[in-house]
Structure formats: C-alpha cells, structure tokens
UniProtKB/Swiss-Prot annotation:
Family, per entry: Belongs to the zein family.
Organism: Zea mays
UniProt signal peptide: 1-21
Lineage of origin: Eukaryota, Viridiplantae, Streptophyta, Embryophyta, Tracheophyta
Its job: Zeins are major seed storage proteins.
GO molecular function: nutrient reservoir activity
Domain of life: Eukaryota
The keyword Ribosomal protein is annotated on this UniProt entry: no
InterPro entries referenced in this protein's UniProt entry, alphabetically: Maize_Zein_Storage, Zein
Miscellaneous comment as given in the Swiss-Prot or TrEMBL entry: The alpha zeins of 19 kDa and 22 kDa account for 70% of the total zein fraction. They are encoded by a large multigene family.
One Pfam family named in its UniProt record: Zein
Protein name per UniProt: Zein-alpha M6
Length: 240
C-alpha cells in the first residue's frame, strides 16, 4: 500500500513538472542560452553550447550563481514538499511495523511482570493522587492479620486444652453459654451459679432433685423478691 501511494505521488510530481516545462527540439541550442540570465559570464554561456556538457554545465552554473528563484521552482516546491511529507509518513509507518512485533515479543516474554504492573497501576495512581488513602490501604491487610492473630491467641489455650484433655474441653464448651451470660448479665449469672450448687448437691439423689424441681419457683421468687417469698411462707404456715 505504501509503495502504491509513493508511486502515485511521484507521478503527480512528474506531471506537475511536465505541465510547467517547455519542450524544445534537441537540435536547437537556442533554448539553453535563452534560459541563462544575461548577467552570467560569457564563457559559461559558450561552454553550455556544447551538447555533451550542456546538462552538467548548466547545473553547475545555476548552483554557483545567485540566481533568483524562477516561477518554475516556486510551482514545483509544493509538490516536492508534499512528496517529502508523504515519504516521511511512509517511513514512520514502516518503522512502526518493524517496532510493534518487537514490543509484542518483549511483552510476551515478560508477561508476568507486565501483568503485575497492570495490577499495581491503580495503587500507583492512588499513591500519586492521595498518599494518605494509599497508606491506609497498605495498612489494611496488616490490621486484618493482627485481628486474626489476636483471635488465634485467645483461642490458643482452648485448642491446647482440647488436644491434651478432651473431657475438660467439652466441659468448657458446655459452660461457655454461662460465661457469655456472665458477660452480658451479671445478676442472672449469679442466680445460675447459686442454682448450680443446688443441682450439684442433689444430683446424687433423684428424689431430692424432684423436690428441688418443685421448689424451684419458690427459690427463684426468693432470689428475685425476698419480701414476696416471706409473705408466701407466712400464708403457707397459716394454711397448714
């Protein structure tokens, strides 16, 4: 495609030159002399009359003298500048076509570092725009790790106890709701601790345990409202 464009531009430049040029017969020597300005030395004009040396001598004479630019050169300069700009564009496209495969090969060879750079790109932009937020994000995994470490440290004695003595660990698991209740409501926990002593005392005697179950509402009433419990005892004594 680039070759076709270059060929068309060269044809355009040649057609411009041909359209602005004047055709003279080869046997005539007058046109060359007429093209030379009158202020050139006469020896240059005589040398240019030689047919073999005419093209070369004419070029030398024009290049050595300070001849004003002719209208023909002014007409040819836009076409030449256009050709030069297009040639530069074609060269840039060819260079790009040569460089892009090399870049792709480098990316494929270093795909892992390239992917890491793409992943870290938002963090780099954030560190540039807002360093404080970037530092918070950097400290966030450390904070999460510290929280998990503290939880593991708290559970470490229970894990060691479970490994050494499973029975004691199960007892602790059974008592865990009571511990949570103690943390949430201390009064209810104390009530349960008082009732636990009664359960442990009468667990060996089922009959006594049944009596304790029957008396449990009165015990709870005595713990919550001693005055009402005392009144119930007086009423019960009067009835019996």
């Amino acid at each position: 495609m680039a070759t076709k464009i270059f060929s068309l531009l060269m044809l355009l430049a040649l057609s411009t030159c041909v359209a602005n040029a004047t055709i003279f017969p080869q046997c005539s020597q007058a046109p060359i002399a007429s093209l030379l300005p009158p202020y050139l030395p006469s020896i240059i004009a005589s040398i240019c009359e030689n047919p073999a040396l005419q093209p070369y001598r004419l070029q030398q004479a024009i290049a050595a003298s300070n001849i004003p630019s002719s209208p023909l050169l002014f007409q040819q300069s836009p076409a030449l500048s256009l050709v030069q700009s297009l040639v530069q564009t074609i060269r840039a496209q060819q260079l790009q076509q040569l460089v892009l495969p090399l870049i792709n090969q480098v990316v494929l060879a270093n795909l892992s570092p390239y992917s890491q750079q793409q992943q870290f790109l938002p963090f780099n932009q954030l560190s540039t725009l807002n360093p404080a937020a970037y530092l918070q994000q950097q400290l966030l995994p450390s904070s999460q790790l510290a929280t998990a470490y503290c939880q593991q440290q708290q559970l470490l004695p229970f894990n060691q106890l479970a490994a050494l003595n499973p029975a004691a660990y199960l007892q602790q698991q059974i008592l865990l709701p009571f511990s949570q209740l103690a943390a949430a409501n201390r009064a209810s926990f104390l009530t349960q601790q008082q009732l636990l002593l009664f359960y442990q005392q009468f667990a060996a005697n089922p009959a006594t345990l049944l009596q304790l179950q029957q008396l449990l509402p009165f015990v709870q009433l005595a713990l919550t409202d001693p005055a009402a419990s005392y009144q119930q005892h007086i009423i019960g004594g009067a009835l019996f």
